[in-house]
């Protein structure tokens, strides 16, 4: 008795199936032993259980920021809820605002965690670097604002000069 054996490469067998997981049942030698499962096949089995392993949770991601930098106006809203006020430093260096936050390793519900980040923002033209202010809300949002540079008074003509 002769048993037919498929000699197609596995990638061709998978590509030629009408729909993944719905290929016609084949013979014993047509099955993909030892090849593992494709990611799509795993997700079809239990998509909700696998999603946390492939997607980074927003609470673990880097802080998010909303930045508004128009000429003469500067505003940053930065989510720093994982840091205490003592762990956050805001300083002006030249025409940049630098934000640094860090906390040492400490226990949390999953083990131990340490966090640190650095952000640097260029001040737009027309903004006074000496007028940069920052405030931390109770929700953990750091607000950094900068006022426009004071307008220079127009030069006055010397007394006795004729106006044209």
From Swiss-Prot:
Keyword Signal: no
Family membership: Belongs to the small heat shock protein (HSP20) family.
BP GO terms, sorted: negative regulation of apoptotic process; protein refolding; response to heat
Region span, Involved in stabilization of the HSPB1:HSBP6 heterodimer: 1-72
GO cellular component: cytoplasm; extracellular region; nucleus
Positions carrying Phosphoserine: 16, 157
Organism: Bos taurus (Bovine)
Name of the gene: HSPB6
Subunit description: Homodimer. Small heat shock proteins form high molecular mass oligomers containing variable number of monomers; these oligomers display a very flexible quaternary structure easily exchanging their subunits. Heterooligomer with HSPB1; formed through oligomerization of HSPB1:HSBP6 dimers; subunit exchange leads to formation of at least two different heterooligomeric complexes, differing in variable quantities of HSPB1 and HSPB6 homodimers in addition to HSPB1:HSPB6 heterodimers.
GO molecular function: protein homodimerization activity; structural constituent of eye lens; unfolded protein binding
The keyword Oxidoreductase is assigned to this record: no
SUPFAM superfamilies: HSP20-like chaperones
Protein name as annotated: Heat shock protein beta-6
Domain sHSP stretches: 56-163
Matches recorded under Gene3D superfamilies: 2.60.40.790
